[in-house]
Amino acid sequence: MSDDATFEKFRACTVEVLQVPEDKVVLEARFGDDLDADSLDLVELVMALEESFDITVEETELEDVTTIGQAFDLISSKL
């Protein structure tokens, strides 16, 4: 899967779980400040991404993830 296709799948999952407009899901967007996502939203998103991409993300890997770009990089590194 190309990076573009991977990001589109990532974006679709994020839009569905966080209930945000697609145009807000950009690499620079911060979960808390730009997308109004709290920690429960992020747990839900990670669970959905794990299922969608058939991967496992450890809780400790999420500690420094604050932006869409960081989350996408983490997911991409597991593919």
Can you say where each PLM-predicted feature lies in the sequence?
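Thiotemplate assembly-line natural product biosynthesis machinery
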Residues: 1-23, 76-79
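Residues in well-ordered alpha-helical elements
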Residues: 8, 23, 43, 66-69
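Phosphopantetheine carrier-protein modules
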Residues: 17-36, 52-64
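Phosphopantetheine-attachment site and its flanking helix in carrier
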Residues: 33-51, 70
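Short, cationic-aromatic polyanion-contact patches
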Residues: 68-76
